[in-house]
Amino acid sequence: TCLAHKQQAVNRLLYRIYSPIXXXF
């Protein structure tokens, strides 16, 4: 569905933002 595709895009964006932070710790 369109909603699922949007959710996937949001999850990928959040991962891209929080990945360096997680990493950092």
UniProtKB/Swiss-Prot annotation:
It comes from Carcinus maenas (Common shore crab). One of its GO terms (biological process) is oxygen transport. This is Hemocyanin subunit 2. Belongs to the tyrosinase family. Hemocyanin subfamily. Coiled coil: none annotated. Its main location: secreted. It is found in: Secreted, Extracellular space. Keywords: Copper, Oxygen transport, Secreted, Transport. Hemocyanins are copper-containing oxygen carriers occurring freely dissolved in the hemolymph of many mollusks and arthropods. One of its GO terms (cellular component) is extracellular region. Hemolymph. The keyword Cell cycle does not apply. One of its GO terms (molecular function) is oxygen carrier activity. It comes from the Eukaryota.
